[in-house]
Amino acid sequence: EIKPPANPLVIPQFCVRFNDIDNVGITGAHYAGFVMLGQHGFFAPKDYDINKYFNDHLTWLNLGLGLDSSHITVHEDAWAGGGNLGPSVEFHSAGLELSNQVYMQYDVRSGKPKELNIKVLDMGQGHERVPWFTQGQETSYETTFPSVVKKLRYLTAIKPDKELMKTFLPYAAWLNIDEVVNVDDAWKRVASKVGMNVKELKPHIQQQAALYSIAEHSRALLFTINDGQLPSNVGGGYNLRVLFRRAMDFIAAYKWDVNIPDLCKLHAAYLKPIFPELSEHLDEVKKILEVEAVKYESTRQKAHSIVERIVRKDVNAETLLQLYDSQGISPELVKEEAAKQNVTIKIPENFYARVAALHEKKAQVYETKKDVVISVPERVPETNALYFDDWHAPRFKATVDYIVDQYVLLDKTHFYPTSGGQLHDKGTIGPYAVVDVFKQGKWIVHKVDAKPKFKIGDVVEAMVDSERRKQLAQHHTATHIINAAARRVLGNHINQASARKTLEKGSIDITHYSRLTEKELIAIEKEANAIIKKALPIKKSFIPREDAERLHSTRIYQGGVAPGKLLRIVDIEKTDVEACGGTHLNTTKEAELIRIISSAKIADDVVRLEYVAGDAAREWGKMSERRSAEIAGLIKKTLNLSIKVTSRLLQEAADVFNVTVEQLPDTLQKFVQQIKENEITFRELGEVHSHKLSRAVSLEQLSQDIFDAWKEQRKELEKIQEKRAAEQMKYVKENSVVQLNADVSSLREIAQKFNQILLINSDGMFVFKGSDKQFEELVKLGAKGGGKELRQGKVDDVKKVLKSFRF
């Protein structure tokens, strides 16, 4: 969709790939994170000259690398991707692929080759291979990160066997999991060439590979985390967690004293002349990796009992894959635990490639979708959207272009359609209320409250609800302000995952590795309101995509990549720049006030913030003050506790019980009362049970404590009832009419086991199982109640029923 920054173009860029992680360290040439040197050209067919591109690269190999053509092997092939296809040429020397030129010529999306209008030269060259080839080191890792490899050799006391590596490396490519059918056979072939048996060769190479993998993975993690990505259990972050845990597994397996954040620091220092930005956020990278290390250790702890059960069964590749994907338990850990039980586990050589392939199929999609689709002729012109210019909602005139039932298309409109997580505008078109607005293709569709009487071609007067527009614009601009504030407070890794803006409140999902503390929330809110107070100008403009990316980087894509050649850029001066099509204020001061009302960790690497701005913030403030005082008084009265009740914690406390803030006082009272009643029940049953509420310091902590106490009581009562029911079963037979010392739950538990039964306790509560006719006889004796298979209720005269009722 966009023009290249230059034509022809040579561009180096750091890339990550995860489909052959198992090769890293083994072949001496593979990386999860590497610099790709791209050579590109975009030409009309008449200007497309494959011979020239081939000769240009051959000249570079001759003069740049000093390679004589007799030492270069050219392998012809074909390459396809993205619906395009073309011949390719791989350049090899001494068994190593140095580069690959692809000559894209055909569009194959239809299933048949079709000549491209623009033909493309697409050459890729792994940068790390060139210095390795020219310097003649044992592997490319020594040349790519010498300081880190040197440090690891010192920490691990592992010295390279140069003679062995010199013999092994020419055949290491035979172990490439992408190209080998049977890895075990490949190891045997390599071992025979080296002059060793597999049992001698493999442990030595794998130990070296572990050292190289730790060096490589730590660099890949440094680049990606510095770029704003987080290890997690979903999406692309899953692959980063795989890298981290693979490195940690090697460290644990060989009992090495290696710290990954320290290696990242060494990488950053070595790369500073080329990538100075890697040294700017090292504290943040360290914190993120330390959190990952805690999660890793937690997984190892819980893994012991899980693996202990699993290894008793047949453990195959699918079992290992499922354990890693669902529990985060690595195959190395399974193998380690299995060995303690004298069980041998075989780990597939391509295990991590299979993990990566599994997660390529999983993706998160954030979009605004309308179920309604109306039929509009293509001749109807595109709607001219006027809402981009100014958030103030004016009265305007427009021509009716098309009408379908209650759906109206105008030649131009100020009405914003539901999109980008922001709700639509409302207002009027003529005498009709606009109840919905949505985008369909090139048109903006207005739904009115009745089939209109005006006709196509009529000029109508329309007006947008200005109060609704203002509130939505405040919430949308607040999203950008909070995103920027969170990044300043929490770190450079903060990005927007998704957002929603309604009339009542807004929400933004930010990428972060842990729950936010009250201190952090206060700091973010304070920073957001400081941005408001500065009255910063908010510039809105349409810019070609390539210019927007060049000026502001790809960070403009918050919450997803915006489509189109032209991007609408919303620029809050020196604060935040995003590609966004929503309605936005003209200055930050117009947002007036922001209050963050709740925070929740909704995914492993995502935190959701809910907030209000403008009038909604002021109304929420008044409501929360009243509610806070009410709840503080309630807690003092019922529990004799003086608890900290802040307005923001109201929502978090309500979330504990899955109720609204308005329902929270009654819910708290109900749960506390139930706890007290349960304590009485325990005493009546002669059971000792007492759960004392902790001296919680916040409303959320107390709410969680109350909920946990209630839940624990419920479980304990169920156990007691089951025990009592089991004890009293000996008094009960089929067709019995029996009085038992048990509550209704226990009576039901016993009755389930019979076809015909009537059980009554001393309070007259009964449970009945039998026919409709038999139940009618019970009703004649004064029973009141009902049900389906099991009927329950109460009788007034227990003795009368026991004496008179029979099956």
For the regions a language model picked out, list residue spans one by one.
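Non-catalytic interaction/regulatory segments
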Residues: 369, 376-383, 503-504, 510-604, ...
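Conserved nucleotide-binding/hydrolysis modules and their immediate coupling elements
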Residues: 362-463, 467
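Conserved phosphate/anionic-ligand binding catalytic regions in large, soluble enzymes, centered on
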Residues: 3-5, 11-14, 30, 82-86, ...
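Extended, domain-scale alpha-helical bundle/helix-rich regions
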Residues: 250-256, 288-375
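Conserved catalytic alpha/beta cores of large enzymes that bind or transform nucleotide phosphates
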Residues: 119-131, 138, 153, 157-187, ...
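Terminal appendage regions of diverse proteins
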Residues: 254, 320-326, 337, 493, ...
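Conserved glycine-bearing catalytic or ligand-binding loops at nucleotide- and phosphate-handling centers
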Residues: 330-390, 421-433, 437, 512-513, ...
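Structured aminoacyl-transfer and RNA-binding surfaces used for tRNA recognition/handling
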Residues: 1-233, 237-241, 251-264, 577, ...
